[in-house]
Curated annotation (Swiss-Prot):
Name assigned to this protein: Chromophore lyase CpcT/CpeT 1
Gene3D superfamilies: CpcT/CpeT domain (2.40.128.590)
Pfam families from the UniProt entry: CpeT
InterPro entries, alphabetized: CpcT/CpeT (IPR010404), CpcT/CpeT_sf (IPR038672)
Source organism of this protein record: Gloeobacter violaceus (strain ATCC 29082 / PCC 7421)
Length: 229
């Protein structure tokens, strides 16, 4: 019979052999190394980065304080789940309000953030809601309760912005000629976006059927700056 000390001394090598066998056969969970994590497709990383930069609360308060002609707008964006969707796209609910009237959003939409078909950019596709008012304040709810039913969406995307990484920022525009619209007297809308870590600049503009600008940024873009992560 082996003593307890002899048994322990034999068990130690045995443990090492068993551990090595488990590792070699894949029975122990493998943790991706930093190098493996960084090996993700560039567009996948970019989609996640665009989502991170869009999510949270941004305002134009600083701009409005320096120029009384500028509106003080709050933009709130949060992740949501589109029921039944199995794609790799990430969905965001976004609403805009005047900072002095937070309970009455004047713009609400769903954004679908995904890699472009050619894998060279990130696309942000915007959807209108059939009934938007009941969704006001959605971002204040727990993530598990932020569910959007497909039937809540009013058809296909109203517009898509293609975002391309340029250094430490993302830049994008609407398609040439803009997108059809019926928002506040505009027959079409255009937008130019620069997305930073600390916020974004946007030249969101609406034009009537004769090509006259009826609302939106003119000489200077709206400068949204992050209020919360």
């Amino acid at each position: 019979m082996l003593s307890s000390g002899q048994s322990e001394s034999l068990n130690q090598p045995m443990r090492m052999v068993i551990c090595c066998l488990l590792l070699s056969t894949g029975l122990l969970a493998a943790v991706p190394s930093p190098a493996e994590q960084n090996a993700l497709p560039a567009t996948e990383r970019q989609v996640e980065e665009v989502v991170t930069r869009l999510t949270g609360i941004m305002t134009t308060t600083q701009q409005a304080q320096s120029d009384a002609a500028r509106p003080d707008v709050r933009m709130t964006t949060c992740s949501v789940q589109l029921e039944g969707d199995k794609s790799k796209a990430i969905y965001l609910y976004q609403e805009q309000t005047m900072s002095n009237n937070l309970g009455a959003p004047y713009r609400q939409r769903l954004l679908r953030i995904a890699a472009s078909a050619d894998g060279r950019a990130v696309e942000s596709a915007g959807f209108k809601f059939v009934e938007a008012k009941p969704l006001a304040g959605l971002c204040a709810k727990p993530a598990a309760e932020r569910l959007i039913a497909p039937m809540a969406l009013d058809g296909d995307p109203t517009c898509t912005v293609r975002l391309v990484q340029a250094g430490d920022k993302y830049m994008g525009t609407t398609p040439e000629g803009g997108c059809q619209s019926n928002v506040r007297g505009a027959a079409r809308i255009t937008n130019e976006i620069t997305l930073y870590k600390e916020g974004m600049d946007t030249r969101d503009r609406g034009f009537d059927a004769q090509g006259n600008q009826v609302w939106g940024a003119k000489e200077e873009p709206y400068r949204f700056r992050r209020l919360t992560p």
